[in-house]
Amino acid sequence: MPSETPHVASSALPPYHVATLYERPDLLNLHQETGGSAWPEFMLHDPVAVANWGKMMSYFAGDQLSLLVGDKIAAVVNMVPLKVDADFGKLPDTGVDWGVEKSVSDHEAGIRPNALMGLQIVVAKEFRGKKFSGIATREVIAHARRHKLEFVVLPVRPNEKHLYPLIPMADYIHWKNPQGLPFDSWLRVHKRLGGDMISICHKSMIIPGTVGEWGDWTGQSFPGSGRYIVPFALNPIDIDLERDRGLYVEPNVWVVHHVTV
């Protein structure tokens, strides 16, 4: 997709401007460092994302945003264009992995997109608590509008779910805060911006590894087979010593924003 000219935010928001990697390829390394900084190591080893990341950065450089405050990256957005069915009940259980593969295959087949799928929004540590998560989400919607796309679809990773790994996602998403809004801060952002929570994608990312790899990724020991809670995982991981295999299956939540012209 073609890129757009960076712009300056209104005075009511923290002063920032937006640049795509198409416009600022020199930001690639810092953009990727910022994007990876918020994740536990194991989240960087989804084989579908790893296999397609280079193509996505090449094909969709105009859809990778850096929100800049001066010469510092305050937040990064990674998203991909793709064709989706307007019957959102058909959004698949495989979430992120589906969107990554479909965006690449749609592009290579010349299929015209009607939606953007957000892969991640990461706010740099220095700028957390300054409303950049909401600002970045608005930029995603604005980006879709500029390119005349109908929808923004997101397999959302709820911010606080990792604190409750034994609670099923189906229960967690219905928790409310005292104001009657979603308990989870990230789901609240989308709710306030008009997003519709559609369904759970139970197998959004599937991350396999050997027991040794899981030890390296988490810094934990796994002396027996079974289910283990690891920091920042939304569900327990499964360890099978006999097969020398660890497996993490990440659930996310499909949220859709309808883009108005």
Predicted regions and their residues:
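Conserved acetyl-CoA-binding loop-helix of GNAT-fold acetyltransferases
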Residues: 120-123, 128-146, 151-154
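Short alpha-helix
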Residues: 184-192
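C-terminal/domain-terminus segments
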Residues: 12-28, 45-48, 134-143, 147, ...
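Conserved acetyl-CoA-binding loop of GNAT-fold acetyltransferases
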Residues: 191-199
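Short amphipathic alpha-helix that is part of the acyltransferase structural core
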Residues: 2-94
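Conserved acyl-donor/pantetheine-binding loop and adjacent beta-alpha core of acyl/acetyltransferases
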Residues: 78-120, 158-183, 201-224, 228-245
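A short catalytic or substrate-binding loop motif that flags glycine-/basic-rich loops and adjacent residues
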Residues: 57-60, 245-250
